[in-house]
Every structure is written in structure tokens, then in C-alpha cells.
Amino acid sequence: IIEESRRSEQFSDFTPIPCKGFNILCKAKRYGRWWVLKGLKKPYRQDENYKNLLHKEFDILISLQHPNIVSAYSMEEIPEMGTCIVMEWIDGITLEHWSGSKTEGEAIFLQLLDAVHYIHAKQIVHRDLKPSNIMITHNGNHVKLIDFGLSDTDDFAILKQPAGTPGYISPEQIVSQQADIRNDIFSIGCILEKILPGKPYTAIIKRCKAPITQRYANIDELKADFMARRNSHLSGIKRIAIAALACIILFGFISYPLLHQQEKSISITPAHHEAKKDTVIRQQAKKPAPLSNGQKSLQPTATEPSSASQAQAAELIS
């Protein structure tokens, strides 16, 4: 039963958030801050089983304090909504609508592993890990794991039944076997396949989705393999980049002398040689041929005008 002090009429600006199943979600403002209210749809509000599920989710959330997990603050009676969990508002999108680089995807996946490792250490199995239950903030691609409505612990026996989402639920969950952390590891493999498909993580995806006895035993083992393959891949890229740079430098050392030699060889090319030869011939043709002994030049000189010129001048004077 919710105490009188926990009743609240101070929320405003209610904005419904689309939600499947038996829950209702609403964004609302109080004290200048946005919150998320999570309650039950009207047909389920008087059902003790569903009321217990909501209380169980609150008890789990209030016990978790992790930067990559949504924070719950209280459970209050909200007009028109009934009993609700009051949670932080996350300004972002779900992973199913996210797109980014491979490096960003790797950072997101590592944050997810940290969050799941934390809840597993507290003996909590999420049981519904999927892209729509992983929020990515607009500011900094910060991961927030949400929706612990199907989560299970050793302290709660209410969910010893099939739970999960097709495409992400493990085979053993489908046949209603008891949940353990390897169910979440199967789902993590499906998520990894969505955001980082192919090499170098193909083997990790395959092992996550293998029969339960062949999967990673825990998140630590999975993370160690992920980091090893990531670092190995980065080292391979660096080696390729260094080799390419070395080839460029080597090509420069080899090609520079050849280009320099080619510039020098321009002066002795046949065409240049013929042009130079023709210039010399033209210059020689302008010079008078040397006279032999006793020969007189047929060309008039500047100091000695020809006899024809002298006769013409005399005629003009007369």
C-alpha cells in the first residue's frame, strides 16, 4: 500500500510514451525536471499478479546504482495513472534506431557489458535484453539499460516462466527452463550481431548463440575475448597503415633521383641537339666568308661606299 506521503499531484505536462504489453509509460514534469512514470494499463491495475510485477521491478531498480542503468527514485500514486514507478528521463533514442561508426558501436557494446556484469554480480538476470531496451543518449552516446519488468532474481519466484522477445530470447527460455545469466549472454550475442556484424566478432557472436553449455560462462569471459579481438584488429589496421606509409616513403626515395636525372637529360635530347645545331648554322651564315689573298670583298663596308653609290651621289649633286 502506498503511504499518503507518497501520493503525488505535482506532475504536469503529461506526454504519453508508446508502450506495448501491460504497462503504461508517460513523460511528465515536476520541479522543472522531466521524469518517466511507469504504471499499469487500466485492465491490469487491480490484478494482484501484475501489481506484484510492478513492485518487483521497483524493488530491483531501487537496488541498482550504476551509470549505465536507468535510475528509479520512488513509487507513487499518480492521478489517472494509478501506482507508478518514478524514473529518470533519458534524452536519447533506443539502440534499434541508433546508427554510428564501428568505433562508437564498440564503445556502446562495452558499456552494455559493464551494465550486465553489474546486475549479474547482484544475481539478477535481465531476461529481455534487446535493442529497444537499451537507450543511447544524444549527448555522448551514453548507454542506459532500461525495462527490468521481466527481470528475475533468486529472491523472486514470480517469473519462473517463459519471458523474452523473439529474435533475442534464448532457446532454453522458450521451453521454460529456469533462467540464468547465460540467457542474457545469448541475447547479448544477438545484439552484437546487429550493431557490429562480421569480423572480427563473428566467433564471439557464434559462441554467444551456441547451446547453453558451450556459451561464455560469464560476462568477464565474454569481455576478455571481445577486447582481445578488438585490440588484435586495431593492431592489424595499424600494421597495414605503417606498411602503406613505408611504401610511400620508399617510393619517394626511389623516384626522386630518377626525376632529377630526367630533368638533366632534357638538354641532350635529339630535338634539343638539332635545334641548337640549327641556331649555330644560322649564326655562321650571317658572318662573311674569309677572303683569300688578293681577293676583294664584294660587300660594301660602312667606311668605304661603293663606286656605284659615289656616281649616284655625284649625279644628284649636279
Briefly describe each language-model feature range:
Residues E80-I93:
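Conserved short submotifs of the Hanks-type protein kinase catalytic core
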Residues I108-F109:
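Activation segment signature within eukaryotic-like protein kinase domains
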Residues L159-E172:
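Conserved activation segment of eukaryotic-like protein kinases, specifically the C-terminal portion
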Residues Y44-S63:
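AlphaC helix of the eukaryotic protein kinase fold
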Residues K209-E221:
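A conserved short helix/loop substructure at the end of the activation segment
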